[in-house]
């Protein structure tokens, strides 16, 4: 299964469309918030009726009707999806990890910080932030 995981595109649709074109085909698109309205076009851009699309609302998605959080299955794994701002991810990750564990998730995915992060915890929890396609904040900004 091939999954495209993105976050914090902030209506810079060209960036997202470019990565969709480069990575297609894939089986699932996960967007971890701050689409700022672009989610209405995801199905059209992916152009694959078999692709599952999962989106959660970020702190800048003021008018979005999407859920703030989702729990989904990815094969045999249980994933907790959230934007992360409600868990203080800009300051520390322990709170979001505790929430993921309380939900019995194998993977927690979040955005908000605009910095990619991948961590494998001793108890097996995987912590993933894809960063931002539009406004990256990590060194090198790519």
Question: Where is each model-derived feature located?
Answer:
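N-terminal active-site segment of His-dependent metallophosphoesterases
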Residues: 1-50, 61-68, 140-142
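A general secondary-structure boundary signal
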Residues: 24-25, 41, 71-73, 104-106, ...
């Amino acid at each position: 299964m091939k999954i495209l995981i993105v976050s914090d595109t902030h209506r810079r649709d060209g960036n997202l469309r470019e990565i969709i074109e480069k990575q297609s085909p894939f089986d699932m698109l996960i967007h971890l918030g701050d689409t700022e309205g672009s989610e209405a076009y995801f199905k059209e851009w992916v152009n694959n009726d078999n692709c599952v699309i999962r989106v959660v609302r970020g702190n800048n998605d003021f008018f979005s009707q999407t859920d703030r959080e989702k729990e989904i299955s990815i094969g045999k794994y249980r994933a907790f999806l959230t934007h992360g701002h409600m868990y203080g991810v800009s300051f520390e990750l322990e709170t979001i990890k505790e929430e993921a564990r309380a939900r019995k998730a194998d993977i927690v995915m979040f955005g908000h910080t605009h910095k990619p992060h991948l961590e494998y915890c001793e108890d097996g929890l995987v912590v993933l932030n894809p960063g931002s396609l539009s406004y990256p904040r990590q060194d090198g900004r790519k």
